[in-house]
Curated annotation (Swiss-Prot):
Signal sequence interval, chain numbering: none
Gene Ontology terms: cellular component: ERMES complex
Family: Belongs to the MDM34 family.
UniProt-recorded name of the protein: Mitochondrial distribution and morphology protein 34
Molecular-function GO terms, alphabetical: lipid binding
Biased composition, class Polar residues, residue ranges: 413-427
Subunit and interaction comment: Component of the ER-mitochondria encounter structure (ERMES) or MDM complex, composed of MMM1, MDM10, MDM12 and MDM34.
Species annotation: Eremothecium gossypii (strain ATCC 10895 / CBS 109.51 / FGSC 9923 / NRRL Y-1056)
Function: Component of the ERMES/MDM complex, which serves as a molecular tether to connect the endoplasmic reticulum (ER) and mitochondria. Components of this complex are involved in the control of mitochondrial shape and protein biogenesis, and function in nonvesicular lipid trafficking between the ER and mitochondria. MDM34 is required for the interaction of the ER-resident membrane protein MMM1 and the outer mitochondrial membrane-resident beta-barrel protein MDM10.
Lineage of producing organism: Eukaryota, Fungi, Dikarya, Ascomycota, Saccharomycotina
GO biological process, one term: mitochondrion organization
C-alpha cells in the first residue's frame, strides 16, 4: 500500500510559502515574539520578518535544567527561501488500523527526498565576552571598560539536500506523531562568512540526530493539530520559564543575602581579592615590597621577586650591610636599585633581576663572612633544587710522587746529619775568617744585578764593612753536592720575623742556605751568587774570636761545630721546647 503525491501541489508556490512560514515558526519557537500567527509578517518579496524585540536584537537566553546557555543569536531566524525541485517519495511498508472509539492508525513508512533547498538568515553576536559577562555571576566577572555589542549578519544556504529515513507514524484524533529511524542525511552548506563555513557544517551534521529525534517530530505534531481542529488556530504551549518579561534578563542569583551569613569571612575575602586582581591587564604589580597581589599566591609575572628574596650569599650579606647603615634615604635608594626601581623607572626590567650566588667584594675584603651561614644557604638551595642533581664531593687523592732528577741529586735529611758532624770535625782544624754583623740592619743585602763592574763594587762594599771573601780551603771530600745542576737565582731581601725595635744578628750564609732548604721544596730551591753552596762545594766560614762582642760569634760553639739552623739551641744540641730558629733570638752571654 502506498500514497501518490499530487504533483501540482508541490509545483504551486503557495505550498512553499506555507512550508517556509511553518519552518520559520518552528525555528523561532523559543523566542517570545514568535509563538502565534501574528508574531511574523510577510513582506512583499515573500520573506518573513520577525517583529518586536527579536528584530531589535534582544533575545532571552535559553534555559535547561536551571542553567542559562550562551546564545549568539541577536535576532530571530528568517527563512527566506524553500524549494523542492524533486517530488518527495513516501512508501508505506506496514499499516495497522484499529476500529475503536478512539481512532488509531499505526504505520511504518520510508521517506525519500532529494535536491531540496533551504535558505535562512539571521544576526549573531561577535563579542562573546559580552555574552559570558551577562550570563555569569557578578563576583566572578571583572569590570570591563569597553564591552559593547557587535552584531554581524549571516546567511546560510542548504542545497543538494538528500534525505532517506524509516519513520513510525501514529495517527490519533488529536494529531500525528512521527519518529525517525535509520536517517541518512547529506547536504551542502554555503555561508556568507567563509571563515565559519567549515565549522558550522561540521556542527550541523553532528547535531542532525537531535533534529530528527526532537525538533521535527514536535514541528509535525504542532502542524497536525491545526488540521484536526478544523482550521482553528492553536497556540503552541510554551513553558513559562522560557518566556521573559519586558525587563532585561538578570543573571540568576546563586546565593541570597541570608546565605552569605553562613559563609566564612576569610574565604569571601580571598574571593574578593582574587576578583580585584583580575581587574587589570598590567603584567607587573605596582607594589614594591610585595611579591604578588594575592597573599600566599605566586604568579608567573612575579617570579623574579621570589627569586630575589630567595636566600643567597649575595642578598644575605647585602641586606646585613644595609641594616647597619645610618642613612635611611640611601638605604631606600639602594633597595629600589636592587629591585630595578628608580624615580625615573618605576616598573622593573627583566635584566635587573639577575643576582649571582656570590659573596660581595666588600665582605671578602673585610673577612666578615661566616662559614656556617654559607653552608646553611648552599644546603638550602640544593634541597630546593631538582632531585635529579647528584651531589658531588670534591675528592683529593694523595699519591706518592716519583722522585725526579733534582730530588735524586738532593741530600736526604739523614745524609745532612752525617755531613754536619763530618763538617764540624774539619772546621776545627781550619783557619777562621772573621764575620762582622751589622747591628743597624736586619736585612741581607741582595746580590748585584749588573755586570762585572757591579760585582766588583759589591765586593768592595763587603770588604769595607768588615766581611772578607772566603779563602781557598781544601775541598771537602765525601760530601754530596747540593743542587749542583740548578741555575743560580738572586734572592730578595728577607725581613726579620722578630719583634721590631731590637736588632737581630745575621745568619751565616751556610745557616741561611740550610734554612732555605728546610722551608722550600728541593725543586724550588735556588742558590744565590754569593752563597756558600757554589759549584757543588762547601766554603767554611772562619770562627771569630771569643773576646769579640758580635752576635755572630755565638753562632758556633768555640769553633768546634757548625751552627746549622735547627740544631743550635741551649740544650746541647737536644731539641727542647724553644721555638725553632730563626724565630727566636740568640741570647748574648759572657
Amino acid at each position: 500500500m502506498s500514497f501518490i503525491f499530487n504533483r501540482e501541489t508541490f509545483e504551486d508556490n503557495s505550498f512553499n510559502e506555507v512550508l517556509r512560514e511553518k519552518l520559520m515558526r518552528a525555528l523561532n519557537l523559543h523566542d517570545r515574539t514568535v509563538g502565534s500567527s501574528s508574531g511574523a509578517m510577510t513582506t512583499g518579496t515573500g520573506a518573513v520578518e520577525c517583529s518586536g524585540a527579536a528584530a531589535a536584537g534582544q533575545r532571552p537566553p535559553r534555559s535547561k535544567g536551571g542553567f542559562s546557555k550562551v546564545d549568539i543569536l541577536k535576532s530571530g531566524i528568517i527563512v527566506k527561501k524553500v524549494e523542492f525541485p524533486t517530488i518527495p517519495k513516501l512508501e508505506i511498508l506496514d499499516l495497522d488500523v484499529s476500529i475503536q472509539s478512539k481512532s488509531l492508525i499505526k504505520g511504518i513508512c520510508k521517506v525519500s527526498c532529494r535536491d531540496a533547498m533551504v535558505q535562512i538568515t539571521t544576526e549573531i553576536e561577535s563579542n562573546l565576552l559580552l555574552l559570558h559577562v551577562n550570563s555569569s555571576p557578578k563576583f566572578t566577572t571583572p569590570k570591563l571598560i569597553s564591552n559593547d555589542s557587535f552584531t554581524v549578519p549571516i546567511t546560510m544556504t542548504f542545497d543538494k539536500l538528500h534525505l532517506e529515513a524509516i519513520t513510525n507514524i501514529f495517527v490519533k484524533n488529536t494529531g500525528v506523531g512521527i519518529s525517525f529511524n535509520d536517517v541518512n542525511l547529506d547536504f551542502r552548506l554555503q555561508c556568507s562568512i567563509k571563515l565559519l563555513q567549515s565549522s558550522i557544517e561540521k556542527r550541523l551534521k553532528a547535531s542532525m540526530e537531535e533534529v530528527f529525534k526532537d525538533v521535527l517530530p514536535s514541528v509535525i505534531f504542532n502542524m497536525s493539530q491545526r488540521w484536526f481542529t478544523h482550521g482553528e488556530t492553536v497556540v503552541p504551549t510554551v513553558d513559562k520559564s522560557m518566556v521573559s518579561s519586558d525587563t532585561p534578563v538578570q543573571p540568576r542569583m546563586i546565593l541570597d543575602e541570608s546565605d552569605l551569613s553562613d559563609l566564612s569571612p576569610a574565604n569571601m575575602l580571598r574571593l574578593s581579592t582574587l576578583v580585584s586582581s583580575r581587574q587589570t591587564l598590567c603584567l607587573n604589580p605596582t607594589a614594591v615590597d610585595t611579591i604578588s597581589t594575592i597573599p600566599g599566591c605566586l604568579e608567573r609575572q612575579n617570579l623574579h621577586r621570589f627569586n630575589l628574596r630567595f636566600p643567597s650569599l649575595y642578598n644575605y650579606y647585602s641586606n646585613k650591610e644595609q641594616q647597619g647603615a645610618h642613612n635611611n634615604e640611601k638605604n631606600r635608594v639602594e633597595h629600589l636599585k636592587l629591585w630595578g626601581r628608580s624615580s625615573s623607572n618605576p616598573i622593573p626590567t627583566r635584566a635587573s633581576f639577575k643576582v649571582e650566588n656570590t659573596l660581595p667584594k666588600e665582605v671578602l675584603d673585610s673577612n666578615s663572612y661566616d662559614v656556617r651561614v654559607i653552608t646553611a644557604i648552599q644546603t638550602k638551595m640544593y634541597e630546593r633544587a631538582s632531585n635529579d642533581v647528584v651531589l658531588r664531593r670534591r675528592k683529593i687523592k694523595m699519591r706518592s710522587r716519583k722522585p725526579s732528577k733534582a730530588n735524586k741529586d738532593a741530600v736526604s735529611p739523614a745524609q745532612n746529619d752525617s755531613g754536619t758532624s763530618s763538617c764540624s770535625n774539619v772546621a776545627s782544624e781550619l783557619p777562621h775568617a772573621s764575620l762582622q754583623a751589622n747591628p743597624q740592619s736586619d736585612e741581607i743585602d741582595p746580590a748585584p744585578e749588573g755586570g762585572p763592574n757591579a760585582e766588583d763594587a759589591y765586593k768592595e762594599e763587603l770588604e769595607d764593612s768588615g766581611l772578607r771573601a772566603p779563602q781557598d780551603f781544601p775541598a771537602l771530600e765525601n760530601v754530596t753536592p747540593v743542587l749542583a745542576q740548578l741555575p743560580n737565582q738572586q734572592r730578595s731581601r728577607l725581613g726579620s720575623p722578630l719583634s721590631a725595635g731590637r736588632p737581630t744578628p745575621l745568619l751565616s750564609p751556610l745557616d741561611d742556605s740550610h734554612w732555605l732548604l728546610q722551608k722550600r721544596d728541593p725543586q724550588d730551591l735556588r742558590t744565590t751568587l754569593y752563597s756558600p753552596i757554589r759549584n757543588g762545594r762547601f766554603y767554611v766560614m772562619p770562627q771569630p774570636q771569643l773576646d769579640t762582642k758580635e752576635a755572630s760569634a755565638f753562632l758556633l760553639e768555640n769553633g768546634k761545630r757548625f751552627g746549622f739552623v735547627g740544631l743550635l739551641n741551649n740544650h746541647n744540641l737536644k731539641w727542647g721546647n724553644d721555638p725553632p730558629p730563626p724565630y727566636r733570638e740568640v741570647s748574648i752571654t759572657q
